Curated annotation (Swiss-Prot):
Located at the top of the head of the 30S subunit, it contacts several helices of the 16S rRNA. In the 70S ribosome it contacts the 23S rRNA (bridge B1a) and protein L5 of the 50S subunit (bridge B1b), connecting the 2 subunits; these bridges are implicated in subunit movement. Contacts the tRNAs in the A and P-sites. Belongs to the universal ribosomal protein uS13 family. Keywords: Ribonucleoprotein, Ribosomal protein, RNA-binding, rRNA-binding, tRNA-binding. Part of the 30S ribosomal subunit. Forms a loose heterodimer with protein S19. Forms two bridges to the 50S subunit in the 70S ribosome. It comes from Synechocystis sp. (strain ATCC 27184 / PCC 6803 / Kazusa). The keyword Chaperone does not apply. This is Small ribosomal subunit protein uS13. GO terms for molecular function: rRNA binding; structural constituent of ribosome; tRNA binding. Residues 90-127 are annotated as: Disordered. Pfam families: Ribosomal_S13.
């Protein structure tokens, strides 16, 4: 089983797809890596030779920030925005959309589930 940056790649998938299971590597970057290392994108992970797996592992470790390092870098950037008091940092802290989207309607992903506010109860009419 190929293990890169602490992540087990799925054995039955093609290498070009399996590399996208690493945080920070998408399909286009996967193609770049395979072209640079000379590994065929059509080979399955279970059929990958130890030599090819080692080539992939060393190339990725030397040239890309992935997984924990990338997550830590992103978290530090967001924290930095909050520390210097920017509008974007404040929006991150409040859990609201950061890039100017409207929030009166929509923005459900960032704001969470709807909380219904109980309406004023009607009192029975007096006779």
């Amino acid at each position: 089983m190929a293990r890169i940056a602490g992540v087990d790649l799925p054995r039955d998938k093609r290498v070009e797809i399996a590399l996208t299971y690493l945080y920070g590597i998408g399909l286009s970057r996967s193609h770049e890596i395979l072209d640079a290392t000379g590994v065929s994108p059509d080979v399955r992970v279970k059929d990958l030779s130890d030599e090819d797996a080692l080539k992939l592992r060393t190339y990725i470790d030397e040239n890309y920030e992935i997984e924990g390092d990338l997550r830590r870098w992103e978290a530090m950037n967001i924290k930095r925005l909050g520390d210097i008091g920017t509008y974007r940092g404040r929006r991150h802290r409040q859990g609201l959309p950061v890039r100017g989207q409207r929030t009166r309607t929509n923005a459900r992903t960032r704001r969470g589930r709807r909380l219904t506010v109980a309406g004023k109860k009607k009192t029975p009419a007096k006779k």
